[in-house]
Regions:
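Non-catalytic structural scaffold of enzyme domains
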Residues: 1-171
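Short, low-complexity, charge-dense intrinsically disordered segments
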Residues: 169-183
Length: 183
């Protein structure tokens, strides 16, 4: 974003957790330099997306309350700081207009995921299709419906718990699935 901005002002749409993380602070210290970074925790946006309200008036209103002040302050580049936010990209494009660059870090995350899988020799061979299994700390049935709605794919969804910074499977089958996924 720092390399893309022409005005020297960048808006970051993220979650409170991201904005308060050490990783985010490290990235800001490393790359922001003289760039003015405007941050917003976008309270409620993840919940709206998870409710399937990606085109709803309420979602548009929230985005306008966040983005319009950033644009008024000179932001010409917006960064999507949450994996949920690409699902509301059409609304963002409409609100921000054609002269604002929107940076979606998902391709970089995908490349890093591929690198990690290659390093661990867990990348599926290109000669066969991979499979998709999603893990959620929420309701598995709801996650399956969201995956179908937002991604247009059917996939197996397993419920897990997040305890003491560790993923805990809820059943023996899920433990096996998760172990296969992480080993």
């Amino acid at each position: 974003a720092a390399a893309q901005t022409r005005s020297g002002v960048v808006g970051v749409l993220a979650t409170p957790g991201t904005l308060s993380s050490h990783r985010y602070a490290s990235l800001m210290a490393r790359y922001a330099g003289d760039i003015e970074v405007l941050e917003d925790p976008c309270l409620g946006l993840v919940q709206l997306i998870e409710a399937g309200a990606t085109q709803a008036a309420e979602t548009r209103d929230l985005l306008q309350r966040v983005v319009v002040p950033m644009l008024a302050a000179g932001a010409d580049t917006l960064v999507l700081g949450c994996t949920h936010y690409p699902f509301i990209r059409p609304l963002l494009d409409d609100i921000a207009g054609p002269n604002v660059t929107i940076i979606d870090p998902a391709p970089a995350v995908a490349r890093q995921t591929r690198n990690v899988l290659q390093q661990r020799d867990q990348l599926a061979p290109a000669t066969r299709a991979g499979s998709l299994c999603c893990y959620t700390t929420g309701d598995a049935a709801r996650m399956a419906a969201l995956t179908a709605d937002l991604l247009g794919v059917q996939c197996r969804v397993r419920a897990v718990r997040w305890t003491n910074n560790e993923v805990i499977a809820n059943t023996r089958e899920e433990a096996t699935d998760y172990a296969d996924f992480t080993d």
